[in-house]
Each structure stands twice: as C-alpha cells, then as structure tokens.
Amino acid sequence: MPATWGDRFQCRHQPRHQCQCHPQMAAALSRPARSKWACRQCETLTQAPVPAQVIDKGIPTAGLLAHVMVAKFADHLPLYRQEKIFGRAGLAIARSTLARWVGQTGVRLQPLVDALREAVLKQGVIHADETPVQMLAPGEKKTHRAYVWAYSSTPFSALNAVVYDFSPSRAGEHARNFLGDWNGKLVCDDFAGYKAGFEQGITEIGCMAHARRKFFDLHVANKSQLAEQALHSIGGLYEIERQARDMSNEDRWRIRQELAVPISKTLHEWMLAQRDLVPNGSATAKALDYSLKRWVALTRYLDDGAVPIDNNQVENQIRPWALGRSNWLFAGSLRSGKRAAAIMSLIQSARMNGHDPYAYLKDVLTRLPTQRASEIGRLLPHQWVPA
C-alpha cells in the first residue's frame, strides 16, 4: 500500500536559486527551498514540484521581470543602463540576458494583448494614431523608419485600453490588417493610410485639435486677427465639451445640439466668407482649407454623444513612445518591436485604469503560467483584481 505523509521524513533540503527584485531596487539571489521526503517503509523519494514560472526553469522571479519591463517601457531606461544599475546592486546581469527576458516575457504576454485587441475592437468608436520609431535593418548596421500604431478606447467609453501595433512602415495596409472587418467610427488625423477603411464602411471622425493647431500656429507667426477669431470660436466648442464631459452620451448630444451646433454653423459660414478674401497658397488660406476640406468629418461628433471632439485621447498614449525612443533610440528588429508593443499595451492600459504598472505586471506574471486560457480575460488591465 502507498505510504502516507505520516510515514515519510525529510531527508534533504534542496535550494533553488532565483533572482528577485526588492522594492528598494536591490536585486538579490533568493533560494526558495524544495524539500525531499523519503518513505520509511519503501524508501521512495518525493520532492515538491518547481513552481510554474513565466520563463520555464529560469532564474528571474515575476517581480524581477516586472521590474525590468516597467523600467524599460514605463520609465524609459534602456537595458544597458539597467545592466549598470544591477551591477551596482551586486548582480552581474548582462544586457543580452535582459533582452532575452524581455523577448520571452513579451511572447508569454501576447495572448493577453490579443484579448485586449478584441476588447478594443468591440467598441463602436475608437481612436487611432501613429508615430515613427527607428528600427535596425536586418543584416545591416543602419536603421530605417518603422511605425507604432496606437488604437484606444474613447474617454466616454467604459473600457480604458490602448493597443499598440508595431509595423515596418506607415503603409495603410497595417491599419487595415489591425482593424480587420471592424466598421465603427474612427477618430484620427488626415493621414491617407486610413482612407481605404473609410471606403469599406468605417466612418471618419476628424480631430478638432488639429484644426485648431493650424490657426494657433498662424496666430503665433504673425498675430493674425483672423486666426484669433477662429481660435475664439473653436474655444467656445471646447468650453461646451468641458461642461458635457461627465454627462451621459444622450445628455452630451443634447447640449451639443443646443449650444455647439449654432457655433459650428456660424464658424463654417465665417470661414467660407474669409476664404474668398485671402490669396491661394498663403498661410491663412492653408489654415482655412484644412478645416473647410474636412468640415464634415470635423463636425460628426455633434451628432453622437459617444464621439469625442478630438483625437487627444490616443495622442496622449503615443507620448510614452516619443519619450522612450529618445532613450533606447531604436528597436533591434521587427520582432523586438512587436514584443515592445505588446508589453507597452499592457503597461499603458494598466495606467489608464489607475493601476501601478509594477504591481499589475508582477501579479499577472505570477498567475499567468497557471491561468486557464478560458479565464485569461481576468488578467486584462480593465478587469484585473489583485490576487
């Protein structure tokens, strides 16, 4: 008959080396013990299994991996700097090792990012923007311009999420591949890469902030009275948005119809009249033309309380990439760029939901190895509850 635990005695204590990170930014070598037990009757040895890890049989704990990811993608510390910081703490961790950990962690987190993408594409209105990132060309020592595309929920949505998509170029096919058969309302700038989607059923929503910026730059350049008048009228539209920010979509639509529609109609008529008075090719004509050519898209927000007035929501989520590229300079490959986009998607979405990125990632990386695929959604930033 099989022996019970009462018939066994501990015969050996086997330490298992792991590298962990303490809150004080000190890394240390921990030795979680795995005891061996022997049966007094049959002398059979039994040992506790190794706890499941994100990196199978790897030495970094979930806390250390979370620290490396947050330091690189939230605090913008390139890996060579982290290597030096760990060195001062008494740990010799090569940047090549850190890079391998980043890649392996990104792979393990990809199912979460795929689920996050599905959640974003269930929204009827989403934001889109893109920004350049240098990428090392395969087999060469020089870089070329790649792009990160950002797709986020709106400030009026119950979902707080952003998903980044790293691509080798700014070709519109990358946006089409990400959006798939989604055909909602897309808030974006006037980039031609989105045009094919508009022809296939996506509704274009213009960005009033871009229109305003044209007049702002004109006013800064020559103190234009025309620009000042345009800024005053657009400012009136934004004041209404501030009043309606915390309203329901239906109430926001009502106040827009009552207050914003008359302002927008007056502004449009004024712009048309002013355009007849200025010469083609002038800075003033260009500022007016930007708004007049996009007026339908710029004012669609007036007819739907769920649609924002501008694209600032996603532009704020693009900013971390601008900060990051000034520190880590470039992506080492297309694959590493995609891994970075995956990790950044979760970190920024965690921030949007008010979570500490380190606490979120540490918990997710701890639970992920044993999480059922059918319950992966519980680890998404907008549904996450600490264990």
Predicted feature descriptions by range:
Residues M1-S35, R40:
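Residue-centric detector for conserved, function-critical "anchor" positions
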Residues P32-A387:
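Catalytic center-proximal scaffold of phosphoryl-transfer enzymes
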